[in-house]
UniProtKB/Swiss-Prot annotation:
<feature type="coiled-coil region">
    <location>
        <begin position="70"/>
        <end position="161"/>
    </location>
</feature>
<feature type="compositionally biased region" description="Low complexity">
    <location>
        <begin position="162"/>
        <end position="174"/>
    </location>
</feature>
<feature type="signal peptide">
    <location>
        <begin position="1"/>
        <end position="23"/>
    </location>
</feature>
<feature type="compositionally biased region" description="Basic and acidic residues">
    <location>
        <begin position="195"/>
        <end position="205"/>
    </location>
</feature>
<feature type="compositionally biased region" description="Basic and acidic residues">
    <location>
        <begin position="68"/>
        <end position="150"/>
    </location>
</feature>
<keyword id="KW-0732">Signal</keyword>
<protein>
    <recommendedName>
        <fullName>Uncharacterized protein YscB</fullName>
    </recommendedName>
</protein>
<feature type="compositionally biased region" description="Polar residues">
    <location>
        <begin position="152"/>
        <end position="161"/>
    </location>
</feature>
<keyword id="KW-0175">Coiled coil</keyword>
<feature type="region of interest" description="Disordered">
    <location>
        <begin position="67"/>
        <end position="221"/>
    </location>
</feature>
<feature type="compositionally biased region" description="Polar residues">
    <location>
        <begin position="175"/>
        <end position="184"/>
    </location>
</feature>
Length: 221
């Protein structure tokens, strides 16, 4: 509202000045007197001081330019929104790729761990089987050695028994072999030993003959 008053006063002063220049000197004096009478000098100066300079560079935008500006701003906002959405989508894709890589690495680690565990168990089982085979071989060898030792002792006893119980030594090696291979079926004659000793010798001979297959257990005396 103040601006309108200032503009009205400004145009009034301009019109007043123009009218004064087009009249005669008498009219000028009369108009000056009238203006002075209507507007006192002090009041006029006071009003002039209140006036502010009006810029002549005022910009007037047309409705079309305004609409174009709004449309451009809207397009720019949409562009920024799309850029932000694309950045967000790219960030989500990157996080998904990273998660997939981590899951793949974890699966590979578990597979390698399971393979190593299976290999360890297979190796342990193989070592256990080798140990069982070794122990079985040792036991078999020990059993064979024990059997050989027992047979050797039995043969030595059979060899020593006739020579120690016989009154006369055998005249030849063939007689010794015959004595060893043919067990006595009856008690020997009295050769200076007691009955118990001769019976034991007889039983040993029969047992040896059964083991060697010379005497049938059912026919043993």
């Amino acid at each position: 509202m103040n601006k309108l008053i200032q503009l009205a006063l400004f145009f009034t002063l301009m019109l007043t000045g123009c009218s004064n220049s087009s009249t005669s000197s008498e009219s000028k004096v009369e108009t000056t007197v009238k203006t002075t009478a209507a507007f006192p000098q002090k009041e006029l100066e006071k009003e002039l001081k209140k006036l502010k300079p009006v810029s002549l560079d005022m910009k007037f935008e047309s409705p079309l330019a305004t609409e174009l500006g709004k449309r451009k701003a809207k397009e720019e906002a949409e562009k920024q929104r799309q850029i932000a959405a694309e950045k967000k989508l790219e960030k989500e894709r990157e996080a998904k790729r990273k998660k997939q890589q981590e899951e793949k690495a974890e699966r590979q680690r578990l597979a390698e761990q399971q393979a190593a565990e299976r290999q360890r168990l297979a190796e342990a089982e193989r070592q256990a089987e080798l140990e069982r085979q070794r122990q079985a071989a040792i036991q078999k060898e020990q059993k064979a050695n024990a059997e050989k030792k027992r047979q050797s002792q039995a043969q030595r006893q059979q060899t020593e028994a006739p020579s120690s119980n016989s009154q006369d030594p055998p005249s030849s090696s063939s007689q010794t072999d015959k004595t060893i291979q043919q067990p006595a079926s009856e008690l020997p004659d009295d050769d200076g030993y007691g009955y118990e000793e001769r019976k034991k010798w007889h039983d040993d001979q029969v047992e040896w003959g059964i083991k060697q297959g010379y005497i049938d257990p059912e026919d043993a005396p």
